[in-house]
Amino acid sequence: MTLQAPSAHDRNLPGLASLNLPPMFISEHCLRTLFYHGPLSPVELAAHWRVPQDVAVEVIESMKGAGLVEPDAGQTTFERHARVRMTAAGQAQVAQARQRTWYAGAMPVSARAFAEGVAAIALAPPDAATLRAALGELSIDETQADELGQAASASDVVLVTGAAPDEQAAVAQAVGGALPGETSLPFAIFAAGAVLRLFDPQRHLLAASDAAHDDALDVMRQHRDTASPWIAVRRPVVTLAGGVRASDVTPAYDEDARFYLAPPPLSALGGLLAVFDADADPAQLAELARLWLLPGKQGTGVVLVRSGERIEVPWRATTLLFAADGEAIGAAGAAAPYRVDIAALTPAALRGVLSTRLGALTPGEDLIEHLAGALADAGADTRVAAARAARYLLDLAAYQGVGGGLDAAVGRAVAYAEGASQRPPAGARRPRRA
């Protein structure tokens, strides 16, 4: 469901009161907008801020009374709808306003409006058929697919073990791609005296209703014909490669523009957050759990700003933690009620994985059967082992060319898959393969 702001509570309030923002911030936001764009009318300001026109009119009238703006030359006969420009007093105040932040896009929403708005959004569960089909292409059976789908329907945390490193992204995209519909988020929120920008054009794909606008991605300067500072987006899929870093759990501060940028977990609001190799840094993973995953059980996330202030925001997102095993993620395991192990492969699934991975070599059935049988005999019929064995043969073919020597290399590929190379002849030295 696409949300329209202001919230139900605020729609009953007149004019500026509907924004539930400090008057000083609204005044300075107007001055910053005029600084960037030059003279604008209340109608143009309302379109730029994505607020009702009566709000923009009230702001301008208030600022006229304070001597901060005046009608632009040749516009005095238009009374309340004239374009206005900053006076000398306004020019002096905008310099101070830009010391606090340079943000001059859509009007930020208050923390309360953000909470009420997110609560009003109904998220549809993933489509079971779509999810089964997408994961089936990765030789993940329906039971495991349904377990992932069940967790996603509750926006819960899942520990996924046994995935090969190079297929973690494919699993995440399969789950994220099965999340139907769209969600909404404000361009920015104002809390703790600071602006936090939520919309990120690199992470958020516009829904059809907003994508029709050519200026949709210009979050600093866009003009719109809607009275809502919320934007409709497809349900986001946000991924973190190489585990969690300290910068992934707290908002980044733009020193030049002087506002905060939403951290990846908050960008994933209403969608999917996936952490690849989550066990790479257990300490930072524990911090993700402390600020987002554990509070997320109550539908809350924690944003820490530079002042040390703690801002609690509404948060819910399906989270996939990919790790080698459940013990490797340490204390963060308490945040993951769902655990799906996709390591083991049936004989048919093993052949399917090998056939897909070796597709560039157009391998014959004999090679696939030979390799699958050798892996099974070695007790290495897992996703990671299959990926390593296939990688070995692909590397060999790239080096020596695709000839008749691949069958002879199966034994070495299996040894490599098990994490050990064949023992070199006595007295010989050979480099270790990473």
Label each PLM-derived region with a short phrase.
Residues S27-L34, T87, V94:
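Hydrophobic residues on short alpha-helical segments
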Residues S139-L321:
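Conserved ASCE/P-loop NTPase catalytic core
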Residues D54-A124:
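Interdomain "pre-motor" coupling segment immediately N-terminal to P-loop NTPase/helicase cores
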Residues L3-H29:
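Short alpha-helical segments that sit at the start of domains
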Residues A283-A289, W315, A328-L361:
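Conserved AAA+ ATPase core "coupling" helix
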Residues Y36-H48:
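Short acidic, hydrophobic short linear motifs in intrinsically disordered regions
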Residues V118-A145:
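Dynamic helix-loop-helix/coil hinge segments at AAA+ ATPase domain boundaries and subdomain interfaces
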Residues G359-A434:
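C-terminal alpha-helical "lid" subdomain
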